[in-house]
């Protein structure tokens, strides 16, 4: 590709205030276990759906999607990654298994012990690891704008540049257009919302495990929710997951979207998630 430029028990859940109001009420709670605390934004009532954000970004990215899912009859849970907001815990010498444990604790305490896990970009790795490690808690897995098994290294460079606050806006916008936003979609919405201080920790957690430990996403039904113009999963890799895992995989492709997907086409994401989840047993 051409480069653009050179185990301990769950201890408690604590009410922690009220966030922006929605029809079903948006609220914040804290899930605590061992030396970890996870801040969770919750809204809606119904079957639980957990939304996990992209690398070095917050679950706030899902605001519109969460509101849409809540209106569609779901209990939407958005755990903030360690190091963001009031989510705390070890940031070094951790693996993807530890981050998956955070999500499992949220599902057990706030999701009635069973949930659909949606992971966007980096979050899809956490979602798959959660499903592999804690299959009884996972009703289904959605990998949204998930990268192919192998992708061009300059895309990783672009992701780093997009969230590098020391670079000029022009440099960051170039990276956002290259790796994240389809032509005609506004990349400026992602000039903010980055937490570069957690990026290395998150990447190290993935690097500490073998890809085959999480790649399958367990055995639950899996939705491969793709963006039509995502360079991390070009059209030639469209059926990669289904070819490997067969009928448990459903492929849906959202047009006019790239790797960012969530801010690009929130309504289409809500519609796709709702349609697929409502067909689950």
Regions found by a protein language model. Give the residues of each.
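Catalytic nucleophile serine of serine hydrolases
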Residues: 121
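Conserved serine/cysteine hydrolase catalytic core
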Residues: 204-244, 253
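Conserved HGGG/HGGXW glycine-rich cap/lid loop of the alpha/beta-hydrolase fold
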Residues: 41-86
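Catalytic active-site module of serine/aspartate enzymes centered on a nucleophile-bearing elbow/loop
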Residues: 248-281
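Conserved alpha/beta-hydrolase catalytic His-Asp/Glu region
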Residues: 152-153, 157, 164-218
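Active-site loop/oxyanion-hole signature of alpha/beta-hydrolase fold enzymes
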Residues: 71, 78-118
């Amino acid at each position: 590709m051409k480069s653009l430029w050179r185990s301990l028990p769950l201890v408690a859940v604590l009410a922690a205030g009220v966030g922006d109001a929605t029809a079903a009420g948006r609220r914040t709670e804290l899930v605590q276990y061992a030396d970890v605390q996870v801040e969770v934004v919750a809204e809606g009532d119904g079957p639980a759906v957990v939304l996990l954000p992209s690398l070095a970004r917050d679950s706030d990215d899902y605001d519109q999607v969460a509101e849409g899912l809540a209106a569609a009859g779901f209990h939407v849970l958005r755990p903030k990654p360690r190091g963001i907001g009031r989510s705390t815990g070890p940031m070094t010498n951790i693996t993807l298994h530890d981050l998956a444990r955070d999500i499992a604790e949220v599902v057990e305490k706030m999701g009635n012990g069973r949930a659909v896990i949606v992971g966007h970009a980096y979050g899809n790795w956490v979602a798959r690891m959660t499903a592999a490690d804690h299959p009884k808690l996972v009703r289904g897995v959605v990998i949204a704008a998930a990268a192919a098994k192998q992708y061009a290294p300059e895309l990783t460079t672009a992701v780093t540049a997009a969230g590098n606050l020391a670079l000029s806006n022009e440099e960051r916008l170039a990276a956002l257009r290259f790796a994240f936003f389809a032509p005609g979609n506004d990349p400026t919405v992602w000039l903010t919302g980055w937490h570069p201080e957690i990026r290395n920790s998150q990447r190290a957690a993935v690097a500490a495990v073998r890809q085959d430990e999480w790649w399958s996403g367990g055995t639950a039904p899996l939705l491969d929710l793709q963006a039509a113009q995502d360079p991390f999963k070009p059209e030639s890799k469209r059926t990669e997951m289904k070819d490997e895992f067969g009928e448990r995989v459903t492929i849906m492709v959202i047009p006019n979207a790239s790797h960012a997907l969530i801010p690009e086409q929130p309504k289409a994401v809500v519609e796709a998630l709702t349609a697929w989840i409502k067909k689950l047993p």
